[in-house]
Amino acid sequence: MLNIVLVEPEIPHNTGAIARTCAATGAKLHLVRPLGFDISDKMVKRCGLDYWYLVDITVYDNLDDYFRQNGDENIWLATTKGSLPYTDADMTGNVSLLFGKETAGLPAWLREKYPDRCIRIPMISEARSLNLSNSVAVITYEALRQQNFPNLKY
């Protein structure tokens, strides 16, 4: 099972696009509060199009709540502060990919707690980061590639 965890997402368009990616890939979407929008926001719904019925979504009050319910086995933290290329991470089996909020990324305490689980998408040094929904899509499809695209058709 592939789990996409958005920690304090701020932009409804991004979350909607990520929900659509989750719907198309069978990944479960986890949202960790606070959210920068109402989950019923029309922009969230619009970006997810008519795929919402395919999205398995759970909302948590905070990261402690998320970890209490899901544990921390086989997690990967997507961060511009990571040193491990995302393609070098073993994303087979039941994996959770954590992504931080658009303006600040994942909290420092979380990165410090799991320094060997911080992965990065390579880019030119002048670029700070990719759009959140693009980052989720890139790493999601790498995880699915490593898992031989379970339940997906060409």
What do the PLM-derived regions correspond to, one by one?
Residues 1-154:
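Post-transcriptional modification and biogenesis factors for structured RNAs
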